[in-house]
Curated annotation (Swiss-Prot):
It comes from the Eukaryota. Its main location: mitochondrion. Keywords: GTP-binding, Membrane, Mitochondrion, Mitochondrion inner membrane, Nucleotide-binding, Transit peptide, Translation regulation. The lineage of its organism: Eukaryota, Metazoa, Chordata, Craniata, Vertebrata. CDD domains: YlqF. Belongs to the TRAFAC class YlqF/YawG GTPase family. MTG1 subfamily. It is found in: Mitochondrion inner membrane. PANTHER family: MITOCHONDRIAL RIBOSOME-ASSOCIATED GTPASE 1. The gene is mtg1. The keyword Transport does not apply. One of its GO terms (cellular component) is mitochondrial matrix. GTP binds at N74, K75, M76, D77, N144, V145, G146, K147, S148, S149, G196. This is Mitochondrial ribosome-associated GTPase 1. Residues 27-200 form the CP-type G domain. GO terms for molecular function: GTP binding.
Length: 311
């Protein structure tokens, strides 16, 4: 079946502006990170594997110095890894040569993290740290990419211990730089967890939308209606039509209102509204499009609509 009619040439973001979506530049968290800098041997940056090139905060590189750096691309189970070779090549062009794809929920590739950290630290000069036998690292990244999940996964694997950091599905769970957390006994490694810090300047509206779909920005700051529409656009662009079966559609759909109506009816998400008629006010039942958009976005985030690569 030819589906070229589904492919919009581009997505219309309307008059939206990126600056209206984001809180302040989270200077408090960044200031806390800087105070710990002299005690660090390595920076571990965690980012979402679905947006490996978008939204990484350049302030981290500018403010946290020339410490050894490891990029963890987490949530690999949700990403289309057929694009992995291209992504690694582009990251290398940007000067990022140490990259590990992980799934912290299933501990996939977690075993590689400590050996890579040890190698990076072993090959670097430890200014003001020569007398210390332990390795101290800081885990950084934008909100809700799995920083705390990585810490807990490392503790499960190397210490057989439980959670040291709270994990949540919304950005902003970790509010401050914590005290030292041990994640390995041999080699002896401690780390600092940090709050998610967004860049004060997002390069484009589309980059902001990608960040929103991955949950690094609170949904209401963007609008679930346009997020759902952009998600449908992306799924159709990548020929990822699992939503058709999931929501019981007959075929792929290009119109977000049609899709949301179907989702609302399938899930029983309706609401009563007052309509003014010639015989007076009448209560009518209509689909709850907001509830449908909410379900569509979260079903995608759980991986039930297939894997994607947003970059």
């Amino acid at each position: 079946m030819r589906l070229s009619w589904l492919l919009r040439k581009s997505f219309d973001f309307g008059e939206r502006e990126v600056a209206h979506w984001f809180p302040g530049h989270m200077a408090k968290g960044l200031k806390q990170m800087k105070t710990k800098l002299k005690n660090l041997d390595c920076i571990v940056e965690v980012h979402d594997a679905r947006i490996p090139l978008s939204g990484r905060n350049p302030i981290f590189q500018d403010s946290l110095g020339m410490k050894p750096h490891l990029l963890i691309l987490n949530k690999m189970d949700l990403a289309d890894l057929t694009q992995k070779k291209r992504i690694l090549a582009q990251l290398k062009q940007q000067g990022v040569g140490n990259v590990i794809f992980t799934d912290c929920v299933k501990d996939q590739n977690i075993k590689h993290v400590v050996p890579v950290i040890s190698e990076l630290v072993g090959c670097s000069q430890r200014f003001h740290r020569e007398e210390n036998t332990e390795t101290c690292i800081m885990v950084i990244g934008v909100p809700n990419v799995g920083k705390s999940s990585l810490i807990n996964a490392l503790r499960r694997m190397h210490l057989r211990k439980g959670k040291a950091s709270r994990v949540g599905a919304e950005p902003g769970i970790t509010r401050s730089v914590l005290t030292k957390i041990q994640v390995s006994e041999s080699p002896l490694i401690f780390l600092f967890d940090t709050p998610g810090v967004l860049s004060p300047r997002i390069e484009s509206v589309e980059t902001g939308m990608k960040l929103a779909l991955c949950g690094t920005i609170l949904d209401h700051l963007v609008g679930e209606d346009i997020m759902a529409d952009y998600l449908l656009y992306i799924l159709n662009q990548q020929m990822q039509h699992r939503y058709v079966e999931h929501y019981g559609l007959e075929k792929p759909c290009a119109d977000i209102e049609t899709l949301l109506k179907r989702i609302a009816l399938k899930l029983g998400k309706t609401q009563k509204v007052k309509a003014i008629t010639g015989v007076g006010d009448v209560n009518i039942t209509v689909p709850n499009y907001n509830a449908a958009a909410y379900d569509f976005i979260r079903t995608f985030r759980r991986g039930q609509l297939g894997v994607v690569m947003l970059d």
